[in-house]
């Protein structure tokens, strides 16, 4: 059992950092219900809502990242960021001195920097978890100072200079991604025996993906030989009207379902034969858990282009195909889909390769690593 009774967790900015942190916090609590867990985040990011919703207390510090443009606004922002760096270190020190943690864990995001750095300086055992195949700036710096570096993919190791050897732990995935059954999921969704293509433009609705999917659905749906579930995202509500203009009315085509969001992702992914999506770390871990072949379209708008590096870990194992957004067209996507669907054995092999990459006991591995850190 983890000897630490008071655990400080720093995670923020995006769900990609926060959700793994919440998963690990939940696992720690499952092993020791008396453990005191305190999160540290920033007031204007997702953690301010997600962490309290999950039932954990959270303290806030004032921190932001640097902008890379040299516009007047960018320069002003960066000057303020330097000021916040000094302020956030003082805030982190006070939180640590008040809470007196016996272990501090960073899951990425700018907030992890001052918190984990200060914890290490004050002699608190420390660990970080890197979700992506290309580490963020914060974790690159912290790796030199912390007691343990945990990785989702060993591809990240070559970009780090850790004080101690890195440990492969994988990324925690919700249990339903391991238990969802394909036949039952298809029955619940009303999908017959035809191949099902599941796709998403992300929560906001990436226009290049939505436009390419309109082309693909317009080309393939009238043939009636496959089914589609596509999530447009918040800004993609135009997709249905565009499909209607092209002669594909989702209300009249029983093989086409258009949603704004997919809130039953484990069921839809279990049911599908091919998944088209971005390449965030959590998404890839879910793909691996369910063993699904995929076409990945990495977001070019993320730090260090890390989604491309994430995607390439699957491509190198013949578990996925990558189309960069700059190369994405409806024609190219349609061509790739038709090529994959025409080779069922090859498609199944891609899924098997994805499943072989899965670290199914990620939460346990992280917990075991933390036990070693505390001693």
Where are these regions (language model features)?
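Conserved nucleotide-sugar phosphate-binding/catalytic loop shared by glycosyltransferases and other
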Residues: 4-14, 31-87, 169, 201, ...
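Active-site-proximal region of nucleotide-activated glycan assembly enzymes
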Residues: 38, 46, 57, 120-182
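Donor-nucleotide binding loops and adjacent catalytic segments primarily
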Residues: 50, 182-275, 308-312, 316, ...
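Structural loop-to-beta junction motif characteristic of Rossmann-like glycosyltransferase folds
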Residues: 56, 124-125, 273-274, 291-299, ...
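Glycosyltransferases and closely related glycan-assembly transferases
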Residues: 91-104, 111-127, 140, 144
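Acidic donor-binding loop of glycosyltransferase active sites
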Residues: 101-103, 266-284, 292
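A short, well-ordered alpha-helix in the C-terminal region of glycosyltransferases
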Residues: 346-360
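C-terminal alpha-helical cap of glycosyltransferases
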Residues: 359-375
């Amino acid at each position: 059992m983890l000897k630490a009774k008071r655990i400080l967790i720093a995670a923020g900015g995006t769900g990609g950092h926060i959700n793994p942190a919440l998963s690990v916090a939940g696992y720690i609590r499952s092993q020791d219900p008396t453990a005191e867990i305190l999160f540290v985040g920033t007031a204007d990011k997702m953690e301010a809502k997600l962490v309290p919703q999950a039932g954990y207390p959270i303290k806030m510090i004032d921190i932001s990242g640097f902008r890379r443009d040299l516009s007047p606004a960018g320069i002003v922002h960066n000057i303020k960021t330097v000021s916040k760096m000094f302020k956030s270190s003082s805030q982190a020190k006070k939180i640590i001195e008040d809470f007196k943690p016996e272990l501090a864990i960073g899951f990425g995001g700018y907030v992890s920097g001052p918190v984990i750095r200060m914890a290490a300086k004050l002699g608190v055992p420390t660990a970080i978890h890197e979700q992506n195949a290309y580490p963020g700036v914060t974790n690159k710096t912290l790796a030199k100072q912390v007691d343990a570096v945990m990785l989702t993919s060993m591809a990240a190791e070559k970009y780090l200079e850790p004080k101690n050897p890195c440990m492969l732990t994988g990324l925690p995935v919700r249990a339903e991604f391991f238990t969802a059954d394909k036949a039952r999921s298809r029955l619940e969704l009303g999908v017959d025996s035809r191949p099902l293509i599941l796709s998403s433009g992300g929560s906001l609705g990436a226009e290049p993906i939505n436009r390419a999917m309109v082309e693909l659905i317009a080309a393939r749906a009238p043939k009636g030989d496959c089914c589609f579930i596509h999530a447009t995202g918040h800004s993609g509500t135009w997709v249905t009207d565009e499909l209607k203009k092209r002669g594909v009315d989702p209300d009249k085509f029983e093989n086409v379902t258009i949603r704004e969001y997919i809130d039953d992702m484990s069921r839809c992914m279990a049911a599908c034969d091919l998944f088209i999506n971005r390449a965030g770390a959590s998404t890839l871990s879910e793909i691996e858990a369910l063993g699904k072949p995929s076409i990945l379209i990495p977001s070019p708008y993320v730090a260090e282009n890390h989604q491309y590096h994430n995607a390439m870990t699957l491509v190198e194992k013949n578990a996925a195909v990558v189309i960069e957004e700059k190369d994405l067209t409806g024609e190219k996507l349609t061509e790739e889909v038709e090529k994959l669907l025409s080779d069922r054995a090859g498609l199944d092999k891609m899924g098997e390769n994805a499943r072989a990459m899965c670290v199914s006991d990620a939460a346990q591995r992280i917990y075991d690593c933390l036990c070693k850190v505390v001693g």
